[in-house]
From Swiss-Prot:
This is Small ribosomal subunit protein bS18. Belongs to the bacterial ribosomal protein bS18 family. Gene3D superfamilies: Ribosomal protein S18. One of its GO terms (molecular function) is small ribosomal subunit rRNA binding.
Amino acid sequence: MKQRNNAKRVRLEQTRRPKKNPLKAAGIEKVDYKDINTLRQFISDRHKIRSRRVTGLTPQQQREVATAVKNAREMALLPFTSR
């Protein structure tokens, strides 16, 4: 029984690696609502804004992305929903 728990713990530790920050990798410092291709990385197939846990962004970057997505939706650059 102990080996089983240890194996499970080892497997969890191996899978929990920090995600790469896509904005930092692309060299983007300020998120712009007009940059639709970048914003689409942070939207799910149901057009919901993805969480930090999924995207690997910092809290400040996540707020900037959320604001940019909302502005792009208001400007009709991104859809609110999918059909």
